[in-house]
Amino acid sequence: MKKSIETPLLLNTKQSQDEDKEKIRWEKMKKVASMAAPMVAVNMSQYLLQATSTMIVGHRSELALAGIALGSSFANVTGFGVLFGLSGSLETLCGQAYGAKQYHKLGSYTFTSIVFLLIISVPISILWMFMNQILLLLHQDPQIAELAGVYCLWLVPALFGYSVLESLVRYFQSQSLIYPMVLSSLAALSFHVPLCWLMVHKFDFGAKGAAASIGISYWLNAVFLWVYMKRSSRCVETRIYMSKDVFVHTNIFFQFAIPSAMMCCLEWLAFEVITLLSGLLPNSKLETSVISICLTTSSLHYNLVNGIGDAASTNVANELGAGNPRGARDSAAAAIIIAAVESVIVSSSLFLSRSVWPYAYSNVEEVISYVTDITPILCISILMDSFLTVLSGIVRGTGWQKIGAYVNITSYYVIGIPVGLLLCFHLHFNGKGLWAGLVTGSTLQTLILFLVIGFTNWSKEAIKARERIGDEKVWRHDSLLN
């Protein structure tokens, strides 16, 4: 009789626990999605800032388009990508400090980032002053190289504005203060488009005007966020102040900043290498055009899915800082599920419209036909990128930037690019082979990061996070270790 009474009680308890777990997962998915959606607007606005400049200048001449496109590529890899990667250190430090309620450290970490990013911008600026000569050494067309060099020179003020802006973006992101960034990004973009058109066409500054307008827009965005941070009551406890702590935090900042920059730059550089290699093929104009279309489409998708990655990074970092390993694990799982849904929707839509969407870039039938043929490979690439971007966000939130950097080197430079070279030049798959090499690298990278995250001991990571941000009351009790 006693056994018959206990059995339904046990079943009811188990059912209740399952329902609670399901409810928690659903709440985590809603939390990640509610942050990811506005972050997409922030990322896309920043991306369109440079993209619209290219489009506006491109209407002047084919030479102008080629020059600004080449200049943008090298500026992104040697400058903006470096700063973007370095600021990724704040996703770990600020995110975990906020979760641990060490609010004052957000301000000091962010100030440290601003100072060092501004300092690092100086040698990058000097490098850009010699961009023309560097491009000539790389056997680029002299006219295009000269225009790209002028564009990069006038882009130098944007570099310093970007240093401040990206640090502030991570500061706000760590606190889930997304809507101020949405407003500032959209305002900057709305200001930038007419300003760029006036400077390029009305005042006839050409590429110089486009670069200058980007710098003005970045600074405008940064000033807006700075004023909000200083004036808003929501930032009282985390406010940024000039402090000597910049030297105290130097070691821990660069501990995450350098591998974070490597993660970012190695991946961006791999895509640029593929674009340059396409120029060595027999029909280089066609091959480069197709690879550029694939790269632009992939970049647009990256800025879409990166919102999910940012949300994953913030939520995982906050939960680890709060000493909540189960919350961190559930946040990571929720972000991966959302990425899976997004990847299926985007890749299947692209595949089903493979004979239509290429017309958004070109009216040349030869280009349309080639892009249609390469679309299935591009769909696999987008499928992998969705997971990879979110997994990379989890890596940054946890503080595994070194692991991410090593995985990037192995995936792209030991496997991906060599496979692309083999398929392209030895087996004569041309541009398809180059892009297939990238897909091979991103697939391997995705699988490795899946394994790393799948076998993670989240309890240990929570303890590391609490120790990292200097919390004296590190949670080592049984609830943390279970």
Swiss-Prot record:
GO molecular function, one term: antiporter activity
Pfam families: MatE
Gene Ontology annotations for the cellular component aspect, listed alphabetically: membrane
Keyword Transmembrane helix: yes
Membrane topology, as annotated: Multi-pass membrane protein
Record InterPro entries: MATE_euk, MATE_fam
GO biological process, one term: response to wounding
Localization in the cell: Membrane
TM stretches of this protein: 32-49, 64-84, 111-131, 144-164, 180-200, 209-229, 261-281, 289-309, 332-352, 374-394, 403-423, 435-455
Keywords of this entry: Membrane, Transmembrane, Transmembrane helix, Transport
Similarity comment text for this entry: Belongs to the multi antimicrobial extrusion (MATE) (TC 2.A.66.1) family.
Protein name: Protein DETOXIFICATION 9
Source organism of this protein record: Arabidopsis thaliana (Mouse-ear cress)
Gene that produces this protein: DTX9
